[in-house]
Swiss-Prot record:
It is an enzyme of class 5 (isomerase). Belongs to the pseudouridine synthase RluA family. This is Uncharacterized RNA pseudouridine synthase MG209. PROSITE patterns: PSI_RLU (PS01129), S4 (PS50889). Disulfide bonds: none annotated. Keywords: Isomerase, RNA-binding. Residues 11-87 form the S4 RNA-binding domain. GO terms for molecular function: pseudouridine synthase activity; RNA binding; rRNA pseudouridine synthase activity. CDD domains: PseudoU_synth_RluA_like, S4.
Amino acid sequence: MKQCFVVTTTKRLDSLLASLLNLSRVKVVKLIMNGQIKVNEKLTFKNSLIVAKDDVIKVEIHDETTSDFITSVEPYNLKLEVLFEDKDLMVINKPSGLLTHPTTFNEKASLLAACIFHNNKNPVYLVHRLDRDTSGAIVVCKNQASLLNLQNQLQNRTLKRYYVALVHFPFNALTGSINAPLARVNNNKVMFKIAQTAKAKQAITKFKVINQNEKAALISLELLTGRTHQIRVHLKFIQHPVYNDPLYGIKSEKKDSYGQFLHANRICFIHPTLNKPMDFHAPLEPKFSTKLKSLNLSLTDPLHVLFK
């Protein structure tokens, strides 16, 4: 089996192939190390290679083992809250607690698997991801052309993502921007930290206070970059950690199984084939709303009005 892709935006080879093939980075690296990837007709064994617009990537699947893991995401019958769907893409309101992509631990239930089932068991492609316990709007493409188009928008910041978070303690400044680079915590495969090192990646988050009291604040956030755990690490850095965050929250806080109170409430982009602006709002989960009420916080307006 052979596949060929024309690159539309500058990106790392392993990151791009992970999206195009619905694979983990680990599995993509195996393909590269096995000599199954060509860039502009030349074999490459460098997973960190930066590919540029109009580069041609060829993937050759020449053994059963590799073919097996290319198609390893099994469809999973799970009811989805579909905010929009057409022949090119879906916008889903992902529930808290659901993996976006299967891990190596053989979980069958994931957003990707559910979308494959919903799409008559045909392949789908993730434009971006949400943490397991982060709920909200996520875009899933039905073809690779739409995927490449939206990933290009993501890199050029014409695809915009907005979140709401319930955080500890009131703010002095009601608006602000957090510009602090992120890197992995040493000897930790899961956690990230603020760092000023060569491996740290630029990360920028804008925030605005919606409502607050002496204990907590409900804030809106816009991602200007899309690093793993970016919002959660940034909010810990400015001493307003997300409520119930198992990784970056207050250690003494009594936590429940819901996970962090972080919700991707809005996503905007240009439709890849219709070429018109699209704007979607994902409602809060009932448990999130209940938590707000328990802290005497409320939305001054519905989310779809507040973030127009």
